[in-house]
Amino acid sequence: MIPGEILTDDGEHELNAGRATITLVVANTGDRPVQVGSHYHFYEVNDALAFDREAARGFRLNIAAGTAVRFEPGQTRTVELVALAGDRVVYGFQGKVMGPL
């Protein structure tokens, strides 16, 4: 075994199984690319991204940890979001929540 190595069972593994998800259409209205990481509170992403922000409160991208989604200028795409887990308390990011959801 290598230090830090994770050994898993054979077969496919479902990410975020049993967690609430939503699908949103997101458009980059800015003139620069915007990249959003896997665990960023989607409600607080760059203001150049246009979408139903209130629906995204308490959600993050439903992608593998350590990955990201890039929105090119003028691009519109559909993304799946997954509910934040744990205590559902958010601090930092753009400072729009700073407490319980």
Swiss-Prot record:
GO biological process, one term: urea catabolic process
Catalytic activity: urea + 2 H2O + H(+) = hydrogencarbonate + 2 NH4(+)
One Pfam family in the UniProt entry: Urease_beta
EC number, as in UniProt: 3.5.1.5
InterPro entries, per the entry: Urease_beta-like (IPR002019), Urease_betasu_sf (IPR036461), Urease_subunit (IPR050069)
Record keywords: Cytoplasm, Hydrolase
One GO location term (cellular component): urease complex
Protein's name in the database: Urease subunit beta
